[in-house]
Amino acid sequence: MGTASSLVSPAGGEVIEDTYGAGGGEACEIPVEVKPKARLLRNSFRRGAGAAAGAGPGSLPRGVGAGGLLGASFKSTGSSVPELEYAAAEYERLRKEYEIFRVSKNQELLSMGRREAKLDTENKRLRAELQALQKTYQKILREKESALEAKYQAMERAATFEHDRDKVKRQFKIFRETKENEIQDLLRAKRELESKLQRLQAQGIQVFDPGESDSDDNCTDVTAAGTQCEYWTGGALGSEPSIGSMIQLQQSFRGPEFAHSSIDVEGPFANVNRDDWDIAVASLLQVTPLFSHSLWSNTVRCYLIYTDETQPEMDLFLKDYSPKLKRMCETMGYFFHAVYFPIDVENQYLTVRKWEIEKSSLVILFIHLTLPSLLLEDCEEAFLKNPEGKPRLIFHRLEDGKVSSDSVQQLIDQVSNLNKTSKAKIIDHSGDPAEGVYKTYICVEKIIKQDILGFENTDLETKDLGSEDSIPEEDDFGDVLWDIHDEQEQMETFQQASNSAHELGFEKYYQRLNDLVAAPAPIPPLLVSGGPGSGKSLLLSKWIQLQQKNSPNTLILSHFVGRPMSTSSESSLIIKRLTLKLMQHSWSVSALTLDPAKLLEEFPRWLEKLSARHQGSIIIVIDSIDQVQQVEKHMKWLIDPLPVNVRVIVSVNVETCPPAWRLWPTLHLDPLSPKDAKSIIIAECHSVDIKLSKEQEKKLERHCRSATTCNALYVTLFGKMIARAGRAGNLDKILHQCFQCQDTLSLYRLVLHSIRESMANDVDKELMKQILCLVNVSHNGVSESELMELYPEMSWTFLTSLIHSLYKMCLLTYGCGLLRFQHLQAWETVRLEYLEGPTVTSSYRQKLINYFTLQLSQDRVTWRSADELPWLFQQQGSKQKLHDCLLNLFVSQNLYKRGHFAELLSYWQFVGKDKSAMATEYFDSLKQYEKNCEGEDNMSCLADLYETLGRFLKDLGLLSQAIVPLQRSLEIRETALDPDHPRVAQSLHQLASVYVQWKKFGNAEQLYKQALEISENAYGADHPYTARELEALATLYQKQNKYEQAEHFRKKSFKIHQKAIKKKGNLYGFALLRRRALQLEELTLGKDTPDNARTLNELGVLYYLQNNLETADQFLKRSLEMRERVLGPDHPDCAQSLNNLAALCNEKKQYDKAEELYERALDIRRRALAPDHPSLAYTVKHLAILYKKMGKLDKAVPLYELAVEIRQKSFGPKHPSVATALVNLAVLYSQMKKHVEALPLYERALKIYEDSLGRMHPRVGETLKNLAVLSYEGGDFEKAAELYKRAMEIKEAETSLLGGKAPSRHSSSGDTFSLKTAHSPNVFLQQGQR
């Protein structure tokens, strides 16, 4: 084991000698061997290795030969004691470390074991929870499926219930209306029997008197509102009518005070006053005869005539002033055309020139010294043959030392002599031509504004439509947004539809339509069906004219749908227009939603509301309703039962009629008979002096035998084609070609080829094609001025000649100043002939897009660009360009302000934006626009844009977002204008309306009061704008159930409406009516005829409604003088004029004159009319009121007694009207302190009221109150108290029945208010019966 000297055992002991030599004989201790510790051995190894390394390469460690490991690990026996101690200490240290290590590891193992056990427990718990969650999930999933199943079943049950509910609702409505109709029939029969009994009694025949029986046949609990009566209140006798019952539903009595309007008594304008403006406007628009196209067109056509001498003046006018006039008319929504022809040496354009003169609004003649004979005929046509009295102007350039020719002087003399009856002005000018042309421009501008457009002020060019000085038209009647262009389009369409040179045998159809109107309700709509071009529009328009003539009390609402996808076929615009028509006939105009869905809900309600109040029938006529997109969805109200007095007539093509409608009663238009077809064609030929040969007539008879060749439009077109060929001299050829055409489309193609071949060159042919294509691809048509700008090389001569040819051949027509196709077949023919393929159509649309885009870039945003450009982008599928166009704030503003809300929404939906995105886009665009705004005008325009955005968002239902732009508009107006400016009041009103809709009534009340204060300061306390704020406050308080405050403000509003000068109607038509008045005025300047006298009377009524009393007085006097000359001084029509003049004098407080006129009218009517005639009763009534007003009570007594007699003869002794007359007479006696005479009259009236109206009727209460006052003044205080107590009980009962909203009546204070008769009772104008 090596050569170590000794190993010492720790236990001590034995000495072992070394027997192997080297040291010899040296004793040592032999240690006891133990197993070395691993750590010790490792340390020993390290030390051994370190020692060997330290010895160097040339030496070996000691004992290496005997084994390196042991020699390196153990010291020799000769080691020192400190080393041993060190090893022992090291050993001890290692042992302790080991023990510590062992213990720590054991603890770690125990900890890990515990942690493992804990994790196992947690794992088991989580596994259990997971299994529980999986079970819960499965359970919830099953519950969800069962809930969905239950939901679907509930939805099915709800749909079934809704269907059953609607079915029951319709059945109940049918039942109710049937019973109402039966009640009406019974009441009508009762009245007829009463009148028969009275006639028999008058003849001396003894009959049974129902008044003597104990039955209650003459009593009913149902009555109408608005019964007029005079009452005596607290010592001061009132003479105003009472409100009557506002809680009754059905009318059962007839009498002057039971009429809902004065029109019900004596026809249109029989007894109209200024507060009946809405009804007056509607009636005048409806019953006045139709006039020429130029009156209603929104195009100002200026026809220029010039000579070689005045060519410089005309060129200067066209260059410098025609664009200004065009811009002025464009700003007001009108077109301006300055049409002129070159000097026509060969007279080849004579027919076209005459046509242009006939269409023109204004003719200007530039003349110097001579007048060529070629122009003489045009001048005579324009200036001397001017039956409609259109404005005319002559610019006569004078020159020193030179005398005009005889022809010039003769023309000027003739025009000067006619100047009293024609609107011809002559400008004589010498000097600078430019100065003379400027004078002409000033005169033309004035003529356009005053005479043609009917505006009163002459400075409209200084006012922008968005300026702060011009309140937008829609604000004149609240929030209703009316598009005058849509209304003009309908008027012109109706005119064109009713124009027919030949009768088509419609009499049998007229009778069927009349039977529908007279048929008992309920009745579904009548379907007028027929093939394309069968004459449906002509039939309906002719029948409407007959109804207006024969039944003036019938309210007719009509709408003529144009081609598909045009504005007239927009369902929301149709419903909105018809709703506004219904609102026009209501007593007040409330806010109208523009949301299409809500419009569909509100229209039937307005229809039912008006039908309950209107005395006559209401007829709704919609032509070509099948052209409306998704017509069944948007016209759902047609399938519901209609009110009793409402009838609906719709026309459809046979092929496109919705299947569900085929079950309705149908009037089918058959093709013309061969005989009628032949007669129409021959008559068309005779109109141009062309006669067909016998052989040609036989061929014609053989040709017109099929349904397509006997179609009304085909026959008309055939006749026009032959007449045109006869004038051109190629009759045989064209007749042969016409025989080859077996339907309308092929015949239209022949017409196109014929007109195209008549063009002079290929350039003209191409222009014709392009014009027709542009009209075809446009939204609503193209104007002539737009065509002239699109094709600058084109002359007016070519354009007017082409349009004349296309118009005569039933291809094109005018509508709202635009060229459009007369018939759908013409539109279809052009599409098939010239627009094959989408690429061609797209190219023409792009041409229009470029034109209108250029307009926008020039800041020319007109109603035309707003109508066409977005629609064209939509048709092209250009979403980004449409998006950019909609963000042009003025385009969107134009669409919204004209009520095209649904159209605007459809564009945004096409772009892919929802409501919130729309709002954000507009806000961002407005903010960007605001950064560039400078100056007061721009800030005012910005405020208008913010206001429009607010109103738009309100209509979208985004009320919280609508507040922000309206508040911003208010801030801008307060800063840019003045805090007390009227436009600030407008902003406050709009902001308040949002808060009302948002149910934040406190905010709304504060804003309305601020607007009221500003309006009162700006306009005065009696202005309609002030009344609007009062009405808004009344509505607000009513929503909060504050009925007393609501009644207070509503009374103030109605009083203002009574006194206000109503220069405009509630909805539309003032400018049109003014132009019509001017036209009527000119038409009455001819011979003395009864019709002209009636027209003068109408004009007097119209000017009276406009508060132009002096002008009204002139026309009424002229009417009276003409009637006295034509009819004689004792004719009833003269009494009508006298009555109207008396009412006018009464209005002017000229009571003496009014008394004389009333007395003359009464004398005539007493001799000419029956004792119970309504006209006699009205004259008696108003003369009696006048006597009372003048204090001539003695004269009034016999008239009031006569009124009692008349009503007894008319309605029987127990009719409420008789009681009203008795009360009026009793009031008069009370004023004269003849209480003894008054008492029995009151008691008799009370008995009639109780028997006929019931003991708790308000009339009974008012009569009791009058009796109480009479007893009080007679000293019978106990009886007075008893009567007054009973009167108060009746009033309290009515108040509780109305939910606290008792109508205002006469009280002891003498305060009077009546909703139905809120008008001054002494102001009535009459008009001739129709």
Swiss-Prot record:
Lipid-binding residues (covalent, N-myristoyl glycine): 2
Chain positions of TPR repeats: 471-504, 885-918, 920-942, 943-976, 985-1018, 1027-1060, 1093-1126, 1135-1168, 1177-1210, 1219-1252, 1261-1294
An example Gene Ontology CC term for this record: ciliary inversin compartment
Signal sequence region: none
Residue ranges of coiled coil: 83-207
Tissue expression pattern: Widely expressed at low level. Expressed in heart, placenta, liver, skeletal muscle, kidney and pancreas. Expressed at very low level in brain and lung.
Keyword terms: Cell projection, Ciliopathy, Cilium, Coiled coil, Disease variant, Lipoprotein, Meckel syndrome, Myristate, Nephronophthisis, Repeat, TPR repeat, Wnt signaling pathway
Location relative to the cell: Cell projection, Cilium
InterPro entries: NPHP3-like_N, NPHP3_ab_dom, NPHP3_hel, P-loop_NTPase, TPR-like_helical_dom_sf, TPR_NPHP3, TPR_rpt
Annotated segments matching region Disordered: 1296-1330
Lipoprotein keyword on record: yes
Statement: the UniProt record of this protein carries the keyword Coiled coil: yes
PROSITE patterns reported for this sequence: TPR (PS50005), TPR_REGION (PS50293)
UniProt feature, compositional bias: Polar residues: 1305-1330
Taxonomy, superkingdom: Eukaryota
GO terms classed as biological process: atrial septum development; cilium assembly; convergent extension; convergent extension involved in gastrulation; determination of intestine left/right asymmetry; determination of left/right symmetry; determination of liver left/right asymmetry; determination of pancreatic left/right asymmetry
Role summary: Required for normal ciliary development and function. Inhibits disheveled-1-induced canonical Wnt-signaling activity and may also play a role in the control of non-canonical Wnt signaling which regulates planar cell polarity. Probably acts as a molecular switch between different Wnt signaling pathways. Required for proper convergent extension cell movements.
Disorder association: Nephronophthisis 3: An autosomal recessive disorder resulting in end-stage renal disease. It is characterized by polyuria, polydipsia, anemia. Onset of terminal renal failure occurr significantly later (median age, 19 years) than in juvenile nephronophthisis. Renal pathology is characterized by alterations of tubular basement membranes, tubular atrophy and dilation, sclerosing tubulointerstitial nephropathy, and renal cyst development predominantly at the corticomedullary junction. Renal-hepatic-pancreatic dysplasia 1: A disease characterized by cystic malformations of the kidneys, liver, and pancreas. The pathological findings consist of multicystic dysplastic kidneys, dilated and dysgenetic bile ducts, a dysplastic pancreas with dilated ducts, cysts, fibrosis and inflammatory infiltrates.
Subunit structure: Interacts with NPHP1 and INVS/NPHP2. Interacts (when myristoylated) with UNC119 and UNC119B; interaction is required for localization to cilium. Interacts with CEP164. Component of a complex containing at least ANKS6, INVS, NEK8 and NPHP3. ANKS6 may organize complex assembly by linking INVS and NPHP3 to NEK8 and INVS may target the complex to the proximal ciliary axoneme.
Protein name: Nephrocystin-3
Originating gene: NPHP3
